[in-house]
Amino acid sequence: MGCSAATFILVALFGSSSWMGTNSVWMQLPLLTSELPEQWNLPSYLAGVVQIACIVPLIYTILHKGVKSFTIPTAPLIIALLSLACCCQLGLSFFWSDYSEIFGAPRSWPLYSLLFGLAIVNAMSNVLFMPFMAQFHPAYLNAYFVGMGLSSLAPSLLSLAQGTSMFKCDEKGVAERFPPNFSVSIFFFVIFSFTCVALFAFIALYRSGAHTHFATPNKKEPNEGTPLKKDLNNTSSSRKGDDEDESPIEIHETGAPAIDAIVSELDVTFREELQKSFRDANYLERSAMINDDSEPHPVDYITGVKFTFLLFTTALVNAQMNGIITSVQSYAALPYSQATYHFAVTLSNVVSPLSSFLPFFISVRSIPVLAILTACSTAMTAFIVYLAALSPNLIFNSVTIGSALSIGGSLIAAGLHSYLRVVFASLLREGHQSESRLFWCGVFIQIGSFIGSAVMFPLVNIAHLFTSAPQCKSIS
């Protein structure tokens, strides 16, 4: 069966919904911090909300793996989640600026609630969307990962077109604001429209039956993301008959991948590894896509101490990326200008998906080299924290130098973190128990992200170790 251009586009649009909601809120932080009462503390609150929401897919996977009677049809659940994302995105366009007093302080609870809903949808995409794509021809994985890249790139480009809220200081030291090219409400409404397109694309994709063209004939659960082990064995035995050389593969009944809630841009690496898993599971053999005599190349799998090291560094990198930097970046950039924060956040989200493609060209397997790169990313994170600790003072007492260092540090950190995250997941994915290894990779991703946010939240909001700078400040 050939690949359809229409199906390719539908899959890409469907994949774009994976993390677009959360990314869209993050792209608006430079404007939200200037409008909402939490001000510079807002990013740390939102990071905590996202991490709490990421517990939901973990619970889902535990139930799906541990409770055999727990079954929910995949496609209807995806439609329900995308509908929830549309509702939350539409709600943001109207209620993002609302707040009320809770526990003696003004809180932007509508923003928290709506972001929580979006984060649930985005995190659940890792345990639902990927298994669903296992039912398609492997060539469509390219389209899905293109869509995942768009979920970060599209809000970033839209934010660049929007610009930021500039201001100038009058003689009395009062900031006079100039609005961006279009408002936060319009931004969220455009993202809402994009999410609706993704929802309708999935419905059209499912109704087209493209996923059934690659399904096994005797598959009993059409809504499962991947077939059960017994179905694989039955199909293989019925097709091969007396063939004794078939390689067994260990596939869990759920077919759910790891809970890698933040690792949404593992584009090329996951594509290659999933295609390899399709080949190992005789997907391609059953559909006559490859010859029976093809064999996977031997790989020096990561085990033992190296495996433990990779899990630890995975947690460390994600703690920095999803917990530490997101909590203090406002303090590291806003003292220099609103535009500095805007470009640091926006361009970082452009660099991240692009860096995820680097392992396709530059693959590193050496543990010492990976340790050095991890140390470099940690040093860059420490530099961003140092800039934040200087606030309201400026490094070298210079707006120009400070802005360049703040933006440059954010871009380098984002690039290193994204690259390392892909490489770690690729190495951990290798092996005969690939799903189990990838599951633990996802667990440590979430552990690292949670610890990073849990450590930074009290430091920012309770201990008040970081200080906001006044908008209008004389520079000597």
From Swiss-Prot:
GO biological process terms held by the UniProt record: IRE1-mediated unfolded protein response; riboflavin transport
Transmembrane segments: 1-21, 42-62, 76-96, 114-134, 141-161, 186-206, 307-327, 343-363, 367-387, 394-414, 438-458
Region (Disordered): 215-249
Expression sites (tissue/organ): Expressed in intestine and pharynx.
Reaction catalysed by this enzyme: riboflavin(in) = riboflavin(out)
Keyword tags: Cell membrane, Glycoprotein, Membrane, Transmembrane, Transmembrane helix, Transport
Claim: Transmembrane helix is one of the keywords in the record: yes
GO MF entries: riboflavin transmembrane transporter activity
GO CC, any one term: plasma membrane
Pfam families the record matches: SLC52_ribofla_tr (PF06237)
Protein family: Belongs to the riboflavin transporter family.
Protein name: Riboflavin transporter rft-2
Organism: Caenorhabditis elegans
Gene name tied to this protein: rft-2
